[in-house]
């Protein structure tokens, strides 16, 4: 199976720019069969039926297979196959053919097979970890509605891996995770404006009474305030936090209150934090919206906020 995955991945990478629409359709059907066969095989899991961790050798084998599958899905979603359809089809048929040959369906079938296999054990492999979060960020940006339609268990696993990525020390993994979160939050924020379903039941409150977006907002704020080397993450973090704050106002206010209460015995610090939180959501002409101009404004606001908040909270 590992050899089949490797050959398929290499074939898609090498040939996708040179195919015509009919050949792209064939490749998609073939890759879907590979994904379905792999999913049915039960391979790639890093735990035995008894729940004990497998040997390091078995973990490495699972890593190689899952990474090959991720690479195949990444090549499929890169745009080369879509471009091949558009460029080879008659102009009046290109759009219809691109919709008919559902590349996203294959990629999401692959994600459905991969997500249950992505554990902390496999994410310890740097190359696989980066590959997974790069693909996740792309799919959440390009197809958030399809992500919202995932079964609850798959969506929950995906969110667990996203939380892992948001806390990861690797800068690339952190940035891709924040990009993925920003795409998901923007989808939910825009859905609320248009009164469409958005993430639907996936937004149900957890045991602490907060939604998944509010939970990840709190996690990200804590990382930005308390951990080292965060200013190189400000742009991606800001793009993720802005739509969450706009959609989760009460949760954001509760978060601000929690930070301020941590310095309640220092009136000067309370004033500094209160003013910083006000400026975060109002300075530089910040408006309601997640357009490009507003994102740039919020990036500046977040950088200024962190300068104050880290100075106040990290000295205690």
Language-model-derived ranges and their functions:
Residues 1-316:
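Karyopherin-beta/Importin-beta family HEAT-repeat alpha-solenoid scaffold
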């Amino acid at each position: 199976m590992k050899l089949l995955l490797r050959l398929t991945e290499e074939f898609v990478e090498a040939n996708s720019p040179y195919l015509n629409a009919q050949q792209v359709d064939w490749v998609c059907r073939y890759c879907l069969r590979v994904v379905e066969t792999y999913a049915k095989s039960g391979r790639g899991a890093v735990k035995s039926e008894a729940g004990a961790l497998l040997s390091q050798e078995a973990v490495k084998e699972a890593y190689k297979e899952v990474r090959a599958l991720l690479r195949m899905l990444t090549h499929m979603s890169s745009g080369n196959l879509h471009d091949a359809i558009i460029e080879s089809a008659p102009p009046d048929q290109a759009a219809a053919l691109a919709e008919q040959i559902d590349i996203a369906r294959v990629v999401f079938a692959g994600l459905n097979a991969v997500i249950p296999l992505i554990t902390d054990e496999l994410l310890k492999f740097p190359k696989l970890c980066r590959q997974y979060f790069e693909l996740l960020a792309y799919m959440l940006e390009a197809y958030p509605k399809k992500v919202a339609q995932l079964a609850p268990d798959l969506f929950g696993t995906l969110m667990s891996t996203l939380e892992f990525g948001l806390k990861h020390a690797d800068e690339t993994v952190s940035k891709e995770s924040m990009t993925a979160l920003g795409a998901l939050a923007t989808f939910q924020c825009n859905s609320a404006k248009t009164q469409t379903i958005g993430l639907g039941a996936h937004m149900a409150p957890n045991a602490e009474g907060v939604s998944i977006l509010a939970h990840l907002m709190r996690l990200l704020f804590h990382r930005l305030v308390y951990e080292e080397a965060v200013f190189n993450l400000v742009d991606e973090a800001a793009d993720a936090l802005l739509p969450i704050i706009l959609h989760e106002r009460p949760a954001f206010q509760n978060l601000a209150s929690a930070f301020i209460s941590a310095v309640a015995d220092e009136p000067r610090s309370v004033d500094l934090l209160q003013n910083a939180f006000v400026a975060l959501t109002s300075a530089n002409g910040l408006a309601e919206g997640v357009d490009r101009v507003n994102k740039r404004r919020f990036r500046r606001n977040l950088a200024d906020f962190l300068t104050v908040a880290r100075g106040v909270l990290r000295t205690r």
